Amino acid sequence: MTELKNDRYLRALLKQPVDYTPVWMMRQAGRYLPEYKATRAEAGDFMSLCKNAGLASEVTLQPLRRFPLDAAILFSDILTIPDAMGLGLYFEAGEGPKFERPITCKADVDKIGIPDPEGELQYVMNAVRQIRKDLKGEVPLIGFSGSPWTLATYMVEGGSSKAFTKIKKMMYAEPAILHLLLDKLADTVIEYLNAQIKAGAQSVMVFDTWGGVLTPRDYNEFSLRYMHKIVDALIRENEGRRVPVTLFTKNGGMWLEQIAATGCDAIGLDWTINIADAKKRIGDKVALQGNMDPSILYAQPERIRQEVSTILEGFGNEGTGHVFNLGHGIHLDVPPENAGVFVDAVHELSKPYHK
């Protein structure tokens, strides 16, 4: 494999010294970039784009041509897993993802198998291999999956949800069925992420987008427990390097200690928590990723720089282990030049903290 020219992102996740704070953006390959829109139009639709390794690699690399980002993230979707399980994923204009065959009972759970990462999901592995080749060792490649709980919310609700009534009904009325589903999903995510690592992902991330809708007790039982199972079973060394694992629960600020106790290398933070507080609580155990509100990218350049400065100051210069990111995905109507201001500000303003 090609030698890695910029390994700052991996070093920061492992709390090793770096000369500036590395940065990437959730959804950095996406609709805010005109070149992405052009490639997506060429593909025809979103899933066709994911399933074409050449085009998936092209959109993964697009933000790196514009901005000096310190990592690339696989262009894919968390719903590849339920789609491969046969739930019939489709997209309705303006409504987001939907499933033709949602999970409603034990028979539905029994029916789904664990998809083969080099079978039904081979297109994802082909994309990973293609991206690694096309990156030529410039920056590391991040692989990812949704968390079992977050995947289950889409599978039981039949798509996106605001109130999560169907899955919460299952959770309280028939918890055994939900545990059966979550267990199957955890086994699937383990195989899926390990296959991404074997195909060339140099770090992996688990997105628990909807963990924050749970009570503290239910978060531990229905979300964290399964992420812990995943962390325990992941390949942690490949190509002679550590493969860092990041867990990200949106609105999970009250559970940082429990998340850190899973043995993950890093925790993703959203913007609702102060990074200085997070560092005080768990900075000795894990690296932190985050945590600027993506909406700040609508602001004037000076305001963006000011926010970057505040977050860097919050993390401080005591110890290492900060990867700068947004607290969630970049919005689709952010001017690309503002993303450039953000990335440049992180590099420039963080250097004094690493002397």
UniProtKB/Swiss-Prot annotation:
Homodimer. PANTHER family: METHYLTETRAHYDROFOLATE:HOMOCYSTEINE METHYLTRANSFERASE RELATED (PTHR21091), UROPORPHYRINOGEN DECARBOXYLASE (PTHR21091:SF169). Catalyzes the decarboxylation of four acetate groups of uroporphyrinogen-III to yield coproporphyrinogen-III. It is an enzyme of class 4 (lyase). The keyword Secreted does not apply. This is Uroporphyrinogen decarboxylase. It catalyses: uroporphyrinogen III + 4 H(+) = coproporphyrinogen III + 4 CO2. The record marks 77 as: Transition state stabilizer. InterPro entries: UROD/MetE-like_sf, Uroporphyrinogen_deCO2ase_HemE, Uroporphyrinogen_deCOase. Its main location: cytoplasm. Belongs to the uroporphyrinogen decarboxylase family. GO terms for molecular function: uroporphyrinogen decarboxylase activity. Pfam families: URO-D. It comes from the Bacteria. PROSITE patterns: UROD_1 (PS00906), UROD_2 (PS00907). Substrate binds at residues 27-31, 77, 154, 209, 328. It is found in: Cytoplasm. Pathway: Porphyrin-containing compound metabolism; protoporphyrin-IX biosynthesis; coproporphyrinogen-III from 5-aminolevulinate: step 4/4. Keywords: Cytoplasm, Decarboxylase, Lyase, Porphyrin biosynthesis. GO terms for biological process: protoporphyrinogen IX biosynthetic process from glutamate. Its EC number is 4.1.1.37. HAMAP family: URO_D. One of its GO terms (cellular component) is cytosol.
